[in-house]
Amino acid sequence: MDISKAPNPRKLELCRKYFFAGFAFLPFVWAINVCWFFTEAFHKPPFSEQSQIKRYVIYSAVGTLFWLIVLTAWIIIFQTNRTAWGATADYMSFIIPLGSA
């Protein structure tokens, strides 16, 4: 999608929609929001909607970073403690590996 051809109010509307979509436990949408609108927020000449786009881009980046840290911590904790948690960990797993490393 080429957002450079869209008018500035449409860019703000898209950025806002992607920001609020990220609250539905979709941190990837926040990451896309940062990638698509970073140049609009920080590298383009000033325009009236730029401050709002900049705010949504910054909040999306913070949300993406937060989810990245939380998911990484959960993956490390689960992988290192899976066998110690016994049946509880098996109920949380889709694929149950044999034994432990």
UniProtKB/Swiss-Prot annotation:
Keywords: Membrane, Notch signaling pathway, Transmembrane, Transmembrane helix. It is a multi-pass membrane protein. The chain crosses the membrane at residues 18-38, 58-78. Its main location: membrane. It is found in: Membrane. The keyword Nucleus does not apply. Residues 1-17, 79-101 are lumenal. Residues 39-57 are cytoplasmic. GO terms for biological process: amyloid-beta formation; membrane protein ectodomain proteolysis; Notch receptor processing; Notch receptor processing, ligand-dependent; Notch signaling pathway; positive regulation of endopeptidase activity; protein processing. Pfam families: PEN-2. InterPro entries: Gamma_Secretase_Asp_P_PEN2. Coiled coil: none annotated. GO terms for cellular component: gamma-secretase complex; late endosome; recycling endosome. Essential subunit of the gamma-secretase complex, an endoprotease complex that catalyzes the intramembrane cleavage of integral membrane proteins such as Notch. It probably represents the last step of maturation of gamma-secretase, facilitating endoproteolysis of presenilin and conferring gamma-secretase activity. PANTHER family: GAMMA-SECRETASE SUBUNIT PEN-2. Belongs to the PEN-2 family. Component of the gamma-secretase complex, a complex composed of a presenilin (Psn) homodimer, nicastrin (Nct), Aph-1 and Pen-2. This is Gamma-secretase subunit pen-2. It comes from Drosophila melanogaster.
